[in-house]
Regions:
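TM-loop-TM module centered on a large, flexible mid-protein loop between adjacent transmembrane helices
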Residues: 1-7, 85-101, 109, 140-206, ...
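Loop-to-transmembrane helix boundary motifs in multi-pass membrane proteins
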Residues: 22-30, 131-139, 143-152, 156, ...
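Membrane-interface loop-to-helix entry segments
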Residues: 24-86, 118, 141-144, 260-274, ...
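Membrane-helix boundary/coupling elements in multi-pass transport proteins
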Residues: 112-131, 187-224, 251, 257-278, ...
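Transmembrane alpha-helical segments of multi-pass small-molecule transport proteins
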Residues: 2-44, 65, 83-84, 237-246, ...
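A generic transmembrane alpha-helix motif of multi-pass inner-membrane proteins
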Residues: 58, 68-71, 257, 262, ...
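Hydrophobic alpha-helical segments and their helix-loop junctions in multi-pass secondary transporters
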Residues: 2-5, 56-91, 157-161, 271-289, ...
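Alpha-helical transmembrane segments of multipass membrane proteins
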Residues: 37-41, 66, 156-158, 195, ...
């Protein structure tokens, strides 16, 4: 927006020559983080009003861009032949046509695009503020996803119809297109509106984090002081300040592309845990059923293992035994899904052809068997207001797709991801496990 003057100035004055860090300390990003931290600390009402204003401006900007682009739509931009592209751009233009880089290119780019959808789950963290969370939260999530999907679908459609895909500017797509069209006024409207769009995205992320910290601290998983709610603002003030401080430091010194990858893999992990949790709760033992089992009966004869795994007796009530079988199947499914997706992404280049197909077919058979085992186990009879349909198929498909997208990310992202998991595990085993109220109750 400022012709990269800020970037050039800081890169010249304070260059950082470390591979995985930013090329310069981004103090502008830190200032924006501080602003949002202060805003969130003042209370929900002022934060909500600011977010509503930015969201409204964002929608107006999007509509302006779409309407302006509709006047220049050319369907031939989806039919460009690679032979019609000049030599300077041909080597980066793929094969031309509607899918110039094929489905492989679409799948490879999906994890980066996935970042645009993060934030819709923030509605679930507002359950304490909702009037009827059992009804409102699921509806809010579905509406948010639908609006986000339609928004991205619309803008990606019009921008590729207006300007050839190989001439797009990946850093500022709409401003670049309008500048090339000579519409300077529209360009600046879109630029300002895009800033509001970034504000809503940042607000969603920074709103969620303090409440996650609050929930963990309230249970005792992390320090109890982080669960204190300010009597004036009615917000978890300490958690908000701490999360803002950490976010500010990270955004100042970590490269933007790497931050996007970290955010993507963290989101994908969260979205993997959710369907796994759905499956665990679906097969949870029914509380009002208590079975007296002797020591002899607790030893399962080998002849009965298949019978119990596939519930050949057609048992309808979930017990601790059936729940244990289901949980083992869920765990094995997740591990097998990791191996299956690794084979899909990296197997062709690492394994011999025969071994590749043997491993691929074996994991597919294993995944199907585990789904059948889960399907045959009796479900919990707990009454729920919102229940995922077609279980275990939809949760298992979600787990597999999320892990597949995680496998598309680079090695350094995985190293950073594993490092964060190790740090989190150390905090949990050293402090959280001993102080968790949920764990103490059990």
């Amino acid at each position: 927006m400022l012709d990269k003057k800020v970037e050039k100035t800081f890169a010249e004055w304070m260059p950082i020559n470390v591979r995985f860090l930013a090329t310069y300390p981004d103090f502008l990003s830190m200032g924006i983080i501080i602003f949002f931290t202060v805003l969130l600390s003042t209370g929900m009402k002022s934060s909500k009003n600011f977010n509503n204003i930015c969201t409204s401006l964002n929608l107006i900007t999007m509509l302006t861009a779409v309407v302006a682009c509709l006047t220049k739509v050319d369907i031939n931009n989806w039919k460009i032949s690679v032979n019609d592209i000049d030599e300077t751009h041909r080597k980066h233009a793929g094969n031309g046509g509607f899918l110039p880089f094929g489905m492989a290119g679409v799948i490879a780019a999906t994890p980066n695009c996935f970042f645009g959808y993060t934030g819709f789950e923030s509605s679930s963290n507002a359950s304490e503020e909702a009037k009827n969370p059992k009804r409102d939260i699921p509806i809010a999530i579905m509406i948010s996803l639908l609006i986000t999907l339609m928004s991205y679908f619309t803008i990606s459609t019009v921008i590729t119809l207006v300007w050839p895909y190989y001439l797009q500017d990946e850093h500022a797509a709409f401003p670049h297109v309008f500048e090339e069209l000579g519409w300077t006024g529209v360009k600046w409207v879109i630029t300002v509106g895009s800033t509001c769009a970034l504000s809503t995205t940042m607000f969603g992320s920074m709103y969620t984090m303090p409440r996650v910290i609050y929930a963990m601290a309230n249970d005792g998983l992390i320090f109890k002081s982080l669960s204190k709610v300010n009597s004036v603002t009615k917000t978890p003030l300490i958690a908000t300040i701490c999360s803002g401080a950490v976010a500010g430091v990270i955004t100042t010194f970590i490269d933007l592309a790497q931050l996007v990858d970290f955010s993507t893999i963290e989101s994908l992990l969260s979205y993997t845990i959710v369907p796994v949790s759905v499956l665990v709760l679906r097969y949870k033992a029914t509380d009002d059923i208590k079975l007296e089992v002797s020591a002899e009966e607790s030893i399962i004869p080998k002849s009965n293992i298949i019978q119990k795994l596939f519930n050949l007796n057609n048992q309808t009530a979930s017990t601790k035994e059936t729940s244990h079988i289901a949980n083992c199947a869920i765990l094995l499914y997740v591990l097998t899904a990791f191996f299956f997706t690794w084979i899909l992404v990296h197997g062709v280049s690492v394994l011999p052809e025969v071994m590749y197909y043997i491993c691929l077919s074996s994991t597919i058979i294993g995944l199907l068997l585990l789904i059948i085992i889960m399907l045959r186990q009796p479900e919990s009879n707990a009454t729920l207001h919102f229940k995922v349909p077609c279980s275990p198929f939809i949760p298992c498909a979600s787990v597999t797709c999320n892990i597949y997208l995680m496998m598309q990310l680079n090695l350094f992202t995985w190293i950073g991801f594993v490092s964060w998991l190790v740090i989190g595990s150390l905090v949990y085993f050293a402090y959280g496990m001993r102080h968790s109220e949920e764990n103490l109750d059990k």
